[in-house]
């Protein structure tokens, strides 16, 4: 696997020198300063590429070229936003950058309720608490009909939890959910958030798939033409939330994408920390079935708790993800490609890491502190080395 590291650009608290010392050779980045929907110019792409290469690294993957909400709702200037997206792909290809990670999650990107969940060893992790999320949705956001998405027990627990929250607890929970986590392309006030949810009141799973199909049928032929590989990132968490449909959550969703636009440019990001939240997702089977279309991997683990919809981000080699079998399946896919004469490695990043050691004293981006990711990258690197030596050294 190609070892990569997500970098948020010149304002990132982790420097490119740090990235190189961590052992990564590739950088995963995006032009976050360009507004959603606008074209990424060749000039801006080359400027970022030069910064990365001057540090002795390569720009391996774009994560992400964001998709404007008008495209997801099929309203407003969606045709112009699609045309802009097509041009951005052409410009990236012209600059030699050919792997693009993206997602089709409506309104919210990845979502957590607690950004400082303290683990037994004193390090901090990200957590999604189903009961806290229910308390937010029913008692702070007050979304009409939200009760239908929860069990009677969850509704009672959420009311009890809300009753114990201080004003600061409520404000922190609201910020964590709607203000935008690292990599998220939108942040909202509570009123803005309600208005954006309202835009989806008539959009169910079938309609969102229909809108996604319009996007894929416009984008994938351009990607194929210019040699770009699109790698969709799964929903996080991989299930409907806030009354919003989610359509990249299961192996059935992956198959729907392939059936909708059967092109090798139409591929996947295997994010084990997202897909792995669902106990019914067999990650190794997903890799084996769709291996030729996996162009990027995020390798981390999560741990489901007593409520199976509550989870926290576990250490990379612990939790519910069998990292050994996952890495073995990815390495096997790389060797299958090699046998076909393809030498390209699959870019891998350790995704998130625990806030630990000296980083506990520093300001860090949630999930993106340096030392926790350094640890995760080293652990996954070790697993891969052992697999390569044990099975492919001859």
UniProtKB/Swiss-Prot annotation:
The Swiss-Prot or TrEMBL record lists the needed cofactor(s) as: Fe(2+); Mn(2+)
Key words of the record: Iron, Lyase, Manganese
Enzyme Commission number: 4.2.1.8
Gene3D superfamilies from the UniProt entry: Divalent-metal-dependent TIM barrel enzymes (3.20.20.150)
Among Pfam families, the record links this protein to: UxuA (PF03786)
Functional pathway: Carbohydrate metabolism; pentose and glucuronate interconversion
GO biological process annotation, one example: D-glucuronate catabolic process
The entry's family comment says:
Belongs to the mannonate dehydratase family.
Q: What is this protein called?
A: Mannonate dehydratase
Q: Which organism is it from?
A: Shigella boydii serotype 4 (strain Sb227)
Q: Gene name?
A: uxuA
